[in-house]
UniProtKB/Swiss-Prot annotation:
It comes from Pan troglodytes (Chimpanzee). The gene is PRNP. A lipid is attached at residue 230 (GPI-anchor amidated serine). GO terms for biological process: cellular response to amyloid-beta; cellular response to copper ion; cellular response to xenobiotic stimulus; intracellular signal transduction; learning or memory; negative regulation of activated T cell proliferation; negative regulation of amyloid-beta formation; negative regulation of apoptotic process. Residues 1-22 form the signal peptide. It is a lipid-anchor; GPI-anchor. Transmembrane segments: none annotated. Residues 23-230 are annotated as: Interaction with GRB2, ERI3 and SYN1. This is Major prion protein.
Length: 253
């Protein structure tokens, strides 16, 4: 880890040093230099933007003031104010006009709330969070009747589980046990309120289904917890702290 931080430090120092040298180089095209910054101006260094069809002042086909085919004020074919063929203010011919454009659609707050629901703390449940939706697992219960009953009624069972952060439990079994109990309780109360009741067979199958989903949720939380711990170790190492301090010094300076 220390070697990785040192190599990253060397790489960023070399990169920022090269950028610093580039910033100090003089830019061409300024005042009293060879390159011209404006079209139509003769200079020893050449013209970076050659005139299109005689673009100087007062030319018969240029874009100057009051010319027959130019884009100045009040010309019939120019791009000035209120002209019938121009791309000026409020005209139909201007493909890049910023006026009269439809406003951008606003973000639907319901969609934002739905996207933030997974993993969010559920109010009124004492710190429980609602996991993301899962596919209901394929489970065999040991008899053709129960297997068929499960396939026909699996849509009535939960596809999300309630859980607390894994660091509040001493083992996976405790996490899964609590997850199963709170999930079945909440789902049963919600469904019963809608007028639907569960039989003993339903409860038995829900316990198996929710148990598998809670195990999956525990594995996801374990992986995320490990990744967060690895990130904290990486950013707390002395080489990385030195690198971040050096980058802040370069940006501020």
């Amino acid at each position: 880890m220390a070697n990785l931080g040192c190599w990253m430090l060397v790489l960023f120092v070399a990169t920022w040093s090269d950028l610093g040298l580039c910033k100090k180089r003089p830019k061409p095209g300024g005042w009293n230099t060879g390159g011209s910054r404006y079209p139509g101006q003769g200079s020893p260094g050449g013209n970076r933007y050659p005139p299109q069809g005689g673009g100087g002042w007062g030319q018969p086909h240029g874009g100057g003031w009051g010319q027959p085919h130019g884009g100045g004020w009040g010309q019939p074919h120019g791009g000035g104010w209120g002209q019938p063929h121009g791309g000026g203010w409020g005209q139909g011919g201007g493909t890049h006009s910023q006026w009269n454009k439809p406003s951008k659609p606003k973000t639907n707050m319901k969609h934002m709330a739905g996207a933030a629901a997974a993993g969010a703390v559920v109010g009124g449940l004492g710190g429980y969070m609602l996991g993301s939706a899962m596919s209901r697992p394929i489970i065999h219960f040991g008899s053709d009747y129960e297997d068929r009953y499960y396939r026909e009624n699996m849509h009535r069972y939960p596809n999300q589980v309630y859980y607390r952060p894994m660091d509040q439990y001493s083992s996976q079994n405790n996490f899964v046990h609590d997850c199963v109990n709170i999930t079945i309780k909440q789902h049963t109360v919600t469904t019963t309120t809608k007028g639907e009741n569960f039989t003993e067979t339903d409860v038995k199958m829900m316990e198996r289904v929710v148990e598998q989903m809670c195990i999956t949720q525990y594995e996801r939380e374990s992986q995320a917890y490990y990744q967060r711990g690895s990130s904290m170790v990486l950013f707390s190492s002395p080489p990385v702290i030195l690198l971040i301090s050096f980058l802040i010094f370069l940006i501020v300076g």
